[in-house]
C-alpha cells in the first residue's frame, strides 16, 4: 500500500514547489537570452539580403496607411466643396444648367484621379507586403533548417555523461518546440514589427506636417489614455496574483488529497476534503468577481476616454476650420494619421514578444550547440592501431557517475583479461559490474586510474575506432523501428547480405527469421515490439557479431528471457565467445560456470578471482550467491520459469545495499525507461482526446443555467454595445456634413458642439454598458468555474482506486485538469456569447442604417466586405493551420530524433551517430522545401488582404462620387454608409480575434462532463448495501483470483484461500510482489476480486455498504501519509463520521506510545506536521498513524509492513505500540522482517499468489521449507 506514496510523491513534490515559486518566479524570472544579432548567426549573405530587402519592403508597406489618409483628406475637401456648391445652387433659383453638370463632371474626374491614387498605393502595398512577408519567411526557413541540423549534430556528439544529467524528453521538446519558437520570432514577425514602426513614424510625420496644433491636442490626450491603462493594469495584476494564490491554495489541497487518495478512501475523508477544497474555491470566486468588476470598469473607462478624445479632437478641429486655419480634410487627415500611428505601437507588441521568446529559446539551443563534449565520438584525433589482440586491463580505476558525483561506484578496481579469455563478473546489484563494461567502451572516463587495450590507455585511442572493435549485447537490447536486416546493418555500415546471414546463423536466429513471412525484410516495430525477448536478443547478438569485434561485452544478456529462450541464446553466446576476449555479467550464475575466470565484485572492488570450483571452496561472495540461488531453486522446482524473479528477490534480501543498487540500475536503464514513458505520455494524450464524446455549446451553457438573470442583462448590454459602432458612424458623418453646407459660422459652431457632445454621450453609454456586460458575464463565469471545479473534484474523489492507477490519471494530470478545464470553459461561454451578440448587433444595425441612407453604395460595399473578410479568415486559418501542418510534417524527423536520442547508448555503442544524423537531415528535406513554398503562398495571401482595403476605398469613393454627381446621395450619406459598413466589419474582425479559443474549451467541457458522469465500479458515495449491527471480525478468502486492472497480464492472486478467526493475528510473509499487500487492499475494497469471494462474518463484502465496511477497518501502512495540519487533526482523521473529542485523541495517542513525545512539543497537539508529515521522523509519523487507526476503534486492524521503514530503536517502540493495539482485535500483519511476527497466531507463506506453507513460527521452522530458508537468510545477513 505504499504504492500511493511512491507513485504520487514525486508529482506532488514537483507541483508543490511550482505553486510556491510561482509568484517569486514572476518577480525575478529573467531568463538568459542571446543578443539580438547572434539570433541570426546562421544566416549567410543570401539570408541577409532577404532580410534587408524584406525590411525595406516592410517600411514602404507601413507608410501606406498614413499616406492614404492624406489622399482621403484632400478628397473630403473636394466633396465638401461640392456639397457647399450644391447647397449654393439649391439656394439660387435661377441657375444655368451648364455650370451644374460641368461642376459635377469635374467632381467625377477628380474622384477618378483619387481612385487612381488609392489604387496606386494599393498596388505598392500589394508588392511591398508580399516581399516583406515572403522574404522574411524565406530567410527564417533557411536559417531554421541549419539550426535544426546543427542542433541534432550537437546532441549526437555529446558524451553519455551529458545525457545522464539532461532529460531525454526535454531534448525532444527543444528540437520541436524551442526551434519553432525561434522560427516564430525571426520570421515574418520582424517584418510586421518594422511595418508597425513605419506606420507609427509616418503617421506622426503626416500629422505634424499637415496640422501640428491638432496633433499636439490629440497627443495631449494620449498620456491620459496610457496612464489610465497602466493604473488599471497594476490593479488588475494585483487581483490576478491574489486570484492565482487562492487557486494555488485550492490546487494544493486537491493535490494533497489526490496524492494521498488511498488514505482518504480508507478513512472515508472525502466529504471533509471536499469542504476544505470548497472553502478555498469560495475565496477565489470572491476575488474573481472583484477582478471582473475592476477589469470591466477599466474597459468601460477606456472607451469613455477614447470617445471623449474624439469629442475633443473634433471640437477643436471645427474651431480651427471655422477660424479658417484648416480645411475639414486636413482635420480628418491629422486625426486619422495620428490615431493610426498611435494604434500601430500596440500592434508591434506580439512581434516583440515573439522575438523575446525566440531569444530565450535560442539561448538553450545555442548553449547545447556550443557545448564541447569531453569524449568526442566525431573526433578524428587519437591512435588507430593496425592490430588489436584484445588484452584488457583495468588499473586502480575509481569512478562515480557525473549525475551523482557523491556516490563512488568503483573504488580502485584492478582486473586483467588475457586475449581470448572469458571473464565473468558477479556480485550484488549496484556493485559496479555494468560500470566496468561502460568504461571499457569509453562511454565515461574513470576519475582515477586507467583502462587499457593491449597496454595502450584507451584515452589515447581514437574513440570511434575503439568502439568499432567492441561488440555489446545488453540486458534490454534496443532494436530500431526498421527491418531485421537494417537492424543488423547498424552493426557495421557496408556489410553484405552473406555476412548478415553468417552472423544470424552464429546467433541461432536464422531459423526463426526464415519462418517469418518477409524474412529479413520483416519490420520489427518500434523498439522491436513485434518480436519476443529471445528473438530480439538474438538479433542483437547478430548485430554485435557482424562487426566481427575483437572484444565482446555481454551485460546480463540472458536475464530477461524465459528458460527456453535462454538456453538457445546461451548456446549462441557460447559460439560467439570463441576466439574473442569476452566480459560477461550475469545474475544467473548457472550461465557463467564455464568462464575462464570468475571475478567476485563487492562495493566497487574485486574481492575474489578464480574458476567455479576454486571459488566454491573459498566460501566467499560467489559461494553465498550460488547457495542462495540454488536454495531458491529447490523450493520452486515446479516453477522454474519464475526463477529469475525469486532469485532477484533473494538477492535483494541478502544485499543490504540493495537500495543504492536500485538507484544505480535505474540510472543505466534510464534512457530506456524514459523513452517508454515518453511514448506512453504521447499515446495517453492522444487516447485522452480521442475517447471523449464531443459536447454541444448548449450542453455547456446548461451548466450555467441558474445564472440566467446575469445572461439576460449581459446580452442586452452586448446588443447596445453592438449598436454603438453604427451610432458613431452617424455622428462622424454628421460632423463632416456640417462643413458641406453653407451655413453661417454660428450655426456650424452650434452643430459641431452638439455632435462633439454626442460623442461624449456615446462614451458615457459605452462605459455603463461595457461595464455591465463584462461584469454580468464575468460573475456568471466565476460562479460556473467554482461549480465545475467542485463537481469535478467531487467526482474524482468518488472514483475507485483502479481509476487512480491508470497512468492517465496521475496526481499531476488530475490537478492540471482541475485547474485548466474549468477556466477554459468559463472563457468560452461568457465572452463567446457576448462577442456573438455584439457582432450580430453591430453588423445588423450598421447594414440596416446603411440601406436607409444609400442602398446602392451599401450593395457595392456588401459585395466587397465578404472578400476582405474571407481573405482575413484565410490568412488566420493559414496562420493557425500552418502551425499544425508544420508539426505534422516534422513528425517524421521527430521520430528519427526521438529514436536516436532515447536509445543514445545503443547508437553510441554501435558508432552510428553519423548515420542517424544523415537520416535526420534527409527527413528535413521535405518540410524545408515546403517551408520555402509556403513563404510565397503566405506572402501572396497577406499582401492580398492588405491591399484589398485600398482597392475597396478606391471603388467605393469613385462610385460614391458618381452617386453624388447624379444627386442620388449626398457626400454626408456616402461617408455614413462607408463608415457604418467598413467600421462594422472591422470591429467584427477585431472582436472575433479576442474570442478565446473555443475549440480548447469544447475539449475541456467534454473532459469535465465525462468525469462528472463517470460512475465508478466501487462507489464510495453509495448508500446501498448491508450495515449489520454487530461485527465479530472473522475474515475468509475463498479461492480468490485477482490481478491489477492496469496490469491485466500479470496474475497476482491465483486462487487464494485464507481464514482468520475473530481476535486472531494472522501474519503474511513472502517475497516482494507475491500478493501480500493485495490481500489488505481487497479487504478494504479498493478493488474487487475477479473470481472467488472475500467474506466478513460469513457475508460477502460486496454486499456490505462500502462506507460501513471501511469504518470498521483500521489501517497502518509502510509509509503512512499525514496531512498538512495539526497532530490532533491528523489523529482525528481516523474517524471522519463524527467529531472526535480531545480525550479520545489523547487516549489513542497513549495507546500508540506517542503521547509523551507530543506533550514535549511546544505546541503539543496543535503542532503542524508539515506537508506529508515532513516535520516528524519516520517512527513518530508511524505512531501517529497507529493512533489515527485506533481512534476509529476498528474491529479489524491491518498492518502493512508498519515497521519496515524504521531504524531498530523506533521499531522497538512502534512494535510495542502495535502489540498493545492488537489486543482483542482481528489483526492481519504483513512483514518483511520476520522477527516481528514470531508471536502471531498463524503465519502464512505466500508464493505466486497462493499459500505455500502455514502454521506457527515453531511449526514452520520444523518444516525446514521456504519460511525456514527466509529466516536463516535474514539471520545470516544480521550476523554479518
Swiss-Prot record:
Catalytic activity: ATP + H2O + xenobioticSide 1 = ADP + phosphate + xenobioticSide 2; ATP + H2O + phospholipidSide 1 = ADP + phosphate + phospholipidSide 2; a 1,2-diacyl-sn-glycero-3-phosphoethanolamine(in) + ATP + H2O = a 1,2-diacyl-sn-glycero-3-phosphoethanolamine(out) + ADP + phosphate + H(+); a 1,2-diacyl-sn-glycero-3-phosphocholine(out) + ATP + H2O = a 1,2-diacyl-sn-glycero-3-phosphocholine(in) + ADP + phosphate + H(+)
Tissue distribution of the protein: Expressed in small intestine. Expressed in liver, kidney and brain.
Lineage top rank: taxon: Eukaryota
Domain ABC transporter: residue ranges: 392-628, 1035-1273
Glycan-bearing residues: 91, 94, 99
PROSITE patterns, sorted: ABC_TM1F (PS50929), ABC_TRANSPORTER_1 (PS00211), ABC_TRANSPORTER_2 (PS50893)
Main location as per UniProt: membrane
Top-rank EC class of the record's enzyme: translocase
Disulphide-bonded residues: none
Keyword RNA-binding: no
Record-level Gene Ontology MF annotations: ABC-type xenobiotic transporter activity; ATP binding; ATP hydrolysis activity; ATPase-coupled transmembrane transporter activity; carboxylic acid transmembrane transporter activity; ceramide floppase activity; efflux transmembrane transporter activity; floppase activity
Transmembrane segments annotated in the record for this chain: 45-67, 117-137, 187-208, 216-236, 293-316, 331-352, 712-732, 757-777, 833-853, 855-874, 935-957, 974-995
Name assigned to this protein: ATP-dependent translocase ABCB1
Species the sequence originates in: Homo sapiens (Human)
Amino acid at each position: 500500500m505504499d504504492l500511493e506514496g511512491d507513485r504520487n510523491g514525486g508529482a506532488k513534490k514537483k507541483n508543490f514547489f511550482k505553486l510556491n515559486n510561482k509568484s517569486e518566479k514572476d518577480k525575478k524570472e529573467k531568463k538568459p537570452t542571446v543578443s539580438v544579432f547572434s539570433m541570426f548567426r546562421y544566416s549567410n549573405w543570401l539570408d541577409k539580403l532577404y532580410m534587408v530587402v524584406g525590411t525595406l519592403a516592410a517600411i514602404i508597406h507601413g507608410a501606406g496607411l498614413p499616406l492614404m489618409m492624406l489622399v482621403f483628406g484632400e478628397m473630403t475637401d473636394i466633396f465638401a466643396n461640392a456639397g457647399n456648391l450644391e447647397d449654393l445652387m439649391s439656394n439660387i433659383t435661377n441657375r444655368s444648367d451648364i455650370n451644374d453638370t460641368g461642376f459635377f463632371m469635374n467632381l467625377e474626374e477628380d474622384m477618378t484621379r483619387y481612385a487612381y491614387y488609392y489604387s496606386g498605393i494599393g498596388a505598392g502595398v500589394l508588392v511591398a507586403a508580399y516581399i516583406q512577408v515572403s522574404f522574411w519567411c524565406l530567410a527564417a526557413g533557411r536559417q531554421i533548417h541549419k539550426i535544426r541540423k546543427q542542433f541534432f549534430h550537437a546532441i549526437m556528439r555529446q558524451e553519455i555523461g551529458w545525457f545522464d544529467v539532461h532529460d531525454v524528453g526535454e531534448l525532444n521538446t527543444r528540437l520541436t518546440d524551442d526551434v519553432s519558437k525561434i522560427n516564430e520570432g525571426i520570421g515574418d514577425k520582424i517584418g510586421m514589427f518594422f511595418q508597425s514602426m513605419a506606420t507609427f513614424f509616418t503617421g506622426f510625420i503626416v500629422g505634424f506636417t499637415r496640422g501640428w496644433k491638432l496633433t499636439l491636442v490629440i497627443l495631449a490626450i494620449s498620456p491620459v489614455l496610457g496612464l489610465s491603462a497602466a493604473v488599471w493594469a497594476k490593479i488588475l495584476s494585483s487581483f490576478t496574483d491574489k486570484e492565482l494564490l487562492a487557486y494555488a491554495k485550492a490546487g494544493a489541497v486537491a493535490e494533497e488529497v489526490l496524492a494521498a487518495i488511498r488514505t482518504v478512501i480508507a478513512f472515508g475523508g472525502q466529504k471533509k476534503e471536499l469542504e476544505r477544497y470548497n472553502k478555498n474555491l469560495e475565496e477565489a470566486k470572491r476575488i474573481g468577481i472583484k477582478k471582473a468588476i475592476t477589469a470591466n470598469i477599466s474597459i468601460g473607462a477606456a472607451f469613455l476616454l477614447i470617445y471623449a478624445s474624439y469629442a475633443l479632437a473634433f471640437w477643436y478641429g471645427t474651431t480651427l476650420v471655422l477660424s479658417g486655419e484648416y480645411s475639414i480634410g486636413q482635420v480628418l487627415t491629422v486625426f486619422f494619421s495620428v490615431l493610426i500611428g498611435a494604434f500601430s505601437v500596440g500592434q508591434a507588441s506580439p512581434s516583440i514578444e515573439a522575438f523575446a521568446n525566440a531569444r530565450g529559446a535560442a539561448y538553450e539551443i545555442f548553449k547545447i550547440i556550443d557545448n564541447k563534449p569531453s569524449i568526442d565520438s566525431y573526433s578524428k584525433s587519437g591512435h588507430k592501431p593496425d592490430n588489436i589482440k584484445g588484452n584488457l586491463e583495468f588499473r586502480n580505476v575509481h569512478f562515480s557517475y557525473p549525475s551523482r558525483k557523491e556516490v563512488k561506484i568503483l573504488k580502485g578496481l584492478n582486473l586483467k583479461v588475457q586475449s581470448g579469455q572469458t571473464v565473468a563478473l558477479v556480485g550484488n546489484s549496484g556493485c559496479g559490474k555494468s560500470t566496468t563494461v561502460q568504461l571499457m567502451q569509453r562511454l565515461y572516463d574513470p576519475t582515477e586510474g586507467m583502462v587499457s587495450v593491449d597496454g595502450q590507455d584507451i584515452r589515447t585511442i581514437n574513440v570511434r575506432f575503439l568502439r568499432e572493435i567492441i561488440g555489446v549485447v545488453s540486458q534490454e537490447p534496443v532494436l530500431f523501428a526498421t527491418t531485421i536486416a537494417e537492424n543488423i546493418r547498424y552493426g557495421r555500415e557496408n556489410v553484405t547480405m552473406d555476412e548478415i546471414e553468417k552472423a544470424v546463423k552464429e546467433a541461432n536466429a536464422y531459423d526463426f527469421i526464415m519462418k517469418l513471412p518477409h524474412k529479413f525484410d520483416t519490420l520489427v516495430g518500434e523498439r522491436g515490439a513485434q518480436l519476443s525477448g529471445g528473438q530480439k536478443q538474438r538479433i542483437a547478438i547478430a548485430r554485435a557479431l557482424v562487426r566481427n569485434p575483437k572484444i565482446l561485452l555481454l551485460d546480463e544478456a540472458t536475464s530477461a528471457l524465459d528458460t527456453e529462450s535462454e538456453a538457445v541464446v546461451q548456446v549462441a553466446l557460447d559460439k560467439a565467445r570463441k576466439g574473442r576476449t569476452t566480459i560477461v555479467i550475469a545474475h544467473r550464475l548457472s550461465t557463467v560456470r564455464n568462464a575462464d575466470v570468475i571475478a567476485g565484485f563487492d562495493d566497487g572492488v574485486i574481492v575474489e578471482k578464480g574458476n567455479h570450483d576454486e571459488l566454491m571452496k573459498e566460501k566467499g561472495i560467489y559461494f553465498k550467491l550460488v547457495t542462495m540461488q540454488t536454495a531458491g531453486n529447490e523450493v520452486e522446482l515446479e516453477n522454474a520459469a519464475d526463477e529469475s524473479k525469486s532469485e532477484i528477490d533473494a538477492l535483494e534480501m541478502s544485499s543490504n545495499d540493495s537500495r543504492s543498487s536500485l538507484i544505480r540500475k535505474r540510472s543505466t536503464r534510464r534512457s530506456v525507461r524514459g523513452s517508454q514513458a515518453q511514448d506512453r505520455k504521447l499515446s495517453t494524450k492522444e487516447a485522452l482526446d480521442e475517447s471523449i464524446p464531443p459536447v454541444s455549446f448548449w450542453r455547456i451553457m446548461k451548466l450555467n443555467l441558474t445564472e440566467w438573470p446575469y445572461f439576460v442583462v449581459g446580452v442586452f448590454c452586448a446588443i447596445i454595445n453592438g449598436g454603438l459602432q453604427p451610432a458613431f458612424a452617424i455622428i462622424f458623418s454628421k460632423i463632416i456634413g456640417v462643413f458641406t453646407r453653407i451655413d453661417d459660422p454660428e450655426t456650424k459652431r452650434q452643430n459641431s458642439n452638439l455632435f462633439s457632445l454626442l460623442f461624449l454621450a456615446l462614451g458615457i453609454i459605452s462605459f455603463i454598458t461595457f461595464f455591465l456586460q463584462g461584469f454580468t458575464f464575468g460573475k456568471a463565469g466565476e460562479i460556473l468555474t467554482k461549480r465545475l471545479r467542485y463537481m469535478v473534484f467531487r467526482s474524482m474523489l468518488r472514483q475507485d482506486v483502479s481509476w487512480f492507477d491508470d497512468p492517465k490519471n496521475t496526481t499531476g494530470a488530475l490537478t492540471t485538469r482541475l485547474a485548466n478545464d474549468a477556466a477554459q470553459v468559463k472563457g468560452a461561454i461568457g465572452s463567446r456569447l457576448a462577442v456573438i451578440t455584439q457582432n450580430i448587433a453591430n453588423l445588423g444595425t450598421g447594414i440596416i442604417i446603411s440601406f436607409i441612407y444609400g442602398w446602392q453604395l451599401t450593395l457595392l460595399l456588401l459585395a466587397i466586405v465578404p472578400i476582405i473578410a474571407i481573405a482575413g479568415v484565410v490568412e488566420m486559418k493559414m496562420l493557425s493551420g500552418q502551425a499544425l501542418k508544420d508539426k505534422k510534417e516534422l513528425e517524421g524527423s521527430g521520430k528519427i530524433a526521438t529514436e536516436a536520442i532515447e536509445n543514445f547508448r545503443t547508437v553510441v555503442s554501435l558508432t552510428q551517430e553519423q548515420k542517424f544524423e544523415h537520416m535526420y537531415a534527409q527527413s528535413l528535406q521535405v518540410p524545408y522545401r515546403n517551408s520555402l513554398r509556403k513563404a510565397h503562398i503566405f506572402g501572396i495571401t497577406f499582401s492580398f488582404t492588405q491591399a484589398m482595403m485600398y482597392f475597396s476605398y478606391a471603388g467605393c469613393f469613385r462610385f460614391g462620387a458618381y452617386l453624388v454627381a447624379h444627386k442620388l446621395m449626398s457626400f454626408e450619406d456616402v461617408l455614413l454608409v462607408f463608415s457604418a459598413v467598413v467600421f462594422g466589419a472591422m470591429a467584427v474582425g477585431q472582436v472575433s480575434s479576442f474570442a478565446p479559443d473555443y475549440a480548447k474549451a469544447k475539449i475541456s467541457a467534454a473532459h469535465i462532463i465525462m468525469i462528472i458522469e463517470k460512475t465508478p465500479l466501487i462507489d464510495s458515495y453509495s448508500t446501498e448495501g448491508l450495515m449489520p449491527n454487530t461485527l465479530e471480525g472473522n475474515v475468509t478468502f475463498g479461492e480468490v483470483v485477482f490481478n491489477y486492472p492496469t496490469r491485466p497480464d500479470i496474475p497476482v492472486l491465483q486462487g487464494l484461500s485464507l481464514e482468520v478467526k475473530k481476535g486472531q493475528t494472522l501474519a503474511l510473509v513472502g517475497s516482494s510482489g507475491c500478493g501480500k499487500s493485495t490481500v489488505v487492499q481487497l479487504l478494504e475494497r479498493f478493488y474487487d476480486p475477479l473470481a472467488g469471494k472475500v467474506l466478513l462474518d460469513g457475508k460477502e463484502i460486496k454486499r456490505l455498504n462500502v462506507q460501513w465496511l471501511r469504518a470498521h477497518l483500521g489501517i497502518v501502512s509502510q509509509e503512512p501519509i499525514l496531512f498538512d495540519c495539526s497532530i490532533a487533526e491528523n489523529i482525528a482523521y481516523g474517524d471522519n463520521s463524527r467529531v472526535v473529542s480531545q480525550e479520545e485523541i489523547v487516549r489513542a495517542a497513549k495507546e500508540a506510545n506517542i503521547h509523551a513525545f507530543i506533550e514535549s512539543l511546544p505546541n503539543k497537539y496543535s503542532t503542524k506536521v508539515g506537508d506529508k508529515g515532513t516535520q516528524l521522523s519516520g517512527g513518530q509519523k508511524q505512531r501517529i498513524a497507529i493512533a489515527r487507526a485506533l481512534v476509529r476503534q476498528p474491529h479489524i486492524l491491518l498492518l502493512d509492513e508498519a515497521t519496515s521503514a524504521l531504524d531498530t530503536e523506533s521499531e522497538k517502540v512502534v512494535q510495542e505500540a502495535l502489540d498493545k493495539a492488537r489486543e482483542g482485535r482481528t489483526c492481519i500483519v504483513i512483514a518483511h522482517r520476520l522477527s516481528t511476527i514470531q508471536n502471531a497466531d498463524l503465519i502464512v507463506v505466500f508464493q505466486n499468489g497462493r499459500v505455500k506453507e502455514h502454521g506457527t513460527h515453531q511449526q514452520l521452522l520444523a518444516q525446514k521449507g521456504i519460511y525456514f530458508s527466509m529466516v536463516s537468510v535474514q539471520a545470516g545477513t544480521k550476523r554479518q
